[in-house]
Amino acid sequence: MSIQERPNRPARGGRGRYTPKRKICSFCAEKVSRIDYKDSAKLARYISDRGKIEPRRRTGTCARHQRALANAIKRARFIALMPFVSEHVRRQGNVATFSPMRELRPEPKVAEPKVEPKVEAKAEAAVPEVKAEVAPAAETSESAESA
């Protein structure tokens, strides 16, 4: 059986049967000359739920409009028209790092820094000196009383 007799199988080295529909740049289709950074509703379509700018392969924008789109989103974020992070990410924290297995694993022990009792050592050294000074004074007073 030759390759020409097998219509259901792709040719060797071929890409297969499924070919995704080619995405067309929406800005080129609408003939947009400039992407406005003030149009936050339109820019929000090109931001993921995590707050990241969507890549070209997902949005279908051309390279020229993807660069302009990224600059417009960055400008809108800088002047506080758009958030850097989505609201639910701000409330919940970094959900991507949460793992149920993390609770089962013991937390790694962190070595605590040793605090040397330098202050206490000086205080103890000072106390015997004071006693040594007091003791001879007591002896001299006793010797003075006995004399």
UniProtKB/Swiss-Prot annotation:
Alphabetic keyword roster: Ribonucleoprotein, Ribosomal protein, RNA-binding, rRNA-binding
Cellular component annotations (GO), alphabetically ordered: cytosolic small ribosomal subunit
Pfam families noted in UniProt: Ribosomal_S18
InterPro entries: Ribosomal_bS18, Ribosomal_bS18_CS, Ribosomal_bS18_sf
Keyword RNA-binding (UniProt): yes
GO biological process: translation
GO molecular function terms attached to this record: small ribosomal subunit rRNA binding; structural constituent of ribosome
PANTHER family: 30S RIBOSOMAL PROTEIN S18, SMALL RIBOSOMAL SUBUNIT PROTEIN BS18M
Function summary: Binds as a heterodimer with protein bS6 to the central domain of the 16S rRNA, where it helps stabilize the platform of the 30S subunit.
Xref: HAMAP family: Ribosomal_bS18 (MF_00270)
Quaternary structure annotation from Swiss-Prot or TrEMBL: Part of the 30S ribosomal subunit. Forms a tight heterodimer with protein bS6.
Protein name per the record: Small ribosomal subunit protein bS18
Organism: Dehalococcoides mccartyi (strain ATCC BAA-2266 / KCTC 15142 / 195)
